[in-house]
Regions:
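Conserved ABC ATPase signature
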Residues: 127-131, 135
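Conserved catalytic motifs of ABC-family nucleotide-binding domains
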Residues: 148
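ABC ATPase NBD coupling module
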Residues: 69-81, 105
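Conserved ABC ATPase "signature" region
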Residues: 108-123
Length: 210
């Protein structure tokens, strides 16, 4: 029997207000090749859960593991990659340089196919600071995907996309899953909700089972 690549076990974390946690007793798991959508209203804890799975924080209680290791100890972009809401792309680099940065760090060939896949090839030599918010969001997704990570965590990946590019992003995330990545997405996007293997509903920081 296959082992989940992501396991969130009875996690309680943060403080929404005095004595009230941002996340309370949340559990989920994801297999390689699965798309897991994390859904909920603003303030329900989606972004906090993404940060925990991406290893940016360790949970106050409970455990979060990626490939059997605590998520907070994983520092390998090929194992665990993140698209945060705040993209943090170096503005002085070109679009192509930003997308391929993880390849350079590892001494690997560039991935011009990803520029094509995310409709960025025509912008390859443009400075990132000159790109639109939607273009920068697609750049950040492509950069997160460039090493084919075991797990990719994305916080609202279509929030700055028009309809056509939202379709494109959803398609590429499904392709990542087909290639074997576990794809965890915090989103309201009906395209991804419809295609998800699992939908985790958060309500006031708790996993709500409709």
């Amino acid at each position: 029997m296959s082992t989940p690549v992501v396991v969130v076990s009875t996690v309680t974390h943060g403080e929404r207000s005095p004595g009230v946690a941002i996340l309370s007793d949340v559990s989920l798991s994801a297999m390689a090749g699965e798309v897991v959508v994390i859904e909920g209203r603003s303030g329900s804890g989606k972004s906090t859960l993404c940060q925990l799975v991406a290893g940016l924080e360790a949970p106050d209680r409970g455990t979060v593991t990626v490939g059997g290791s605590p998520a907070a100890s994983v520092r390998d972009w090929a194992r665990l990659a993140l698209l945060p809401q705040r993209l943090g792309l170096p503005a002085e680099l070109t679009v192509a340089e930003n997308v391929t940065l993880p390849c350079w760090v590892r001494g690997m060939p560039a991935r011009p196919d990803l520029l094509e896949a995310f409709d960025l090839a025509h912008l390859a030599d443009r400075r990132t600071g000159e790109a639109s918010r939607g273009e920068q969001q697609r750049m950040a997704i492509a950069r997160a995907a460039v090493l084919g990570p075991d797990v990719i965590v994305l916080d609202e990946p279509t929030s700055h996309q028009d309809e056509a590019h939202a379709d494109l992003v959803a398609h590429q995330l499904l392709e990542l899953a087909r290639a074997g990545s576990a794809v965890l997405v915090a989103t309201h996007d009906p395209r991804l909700v419809a295609e998800a293997d699992q939908v985790v509903h958060l309500h006031a920081g708790r996993h709500h089972h409709p």
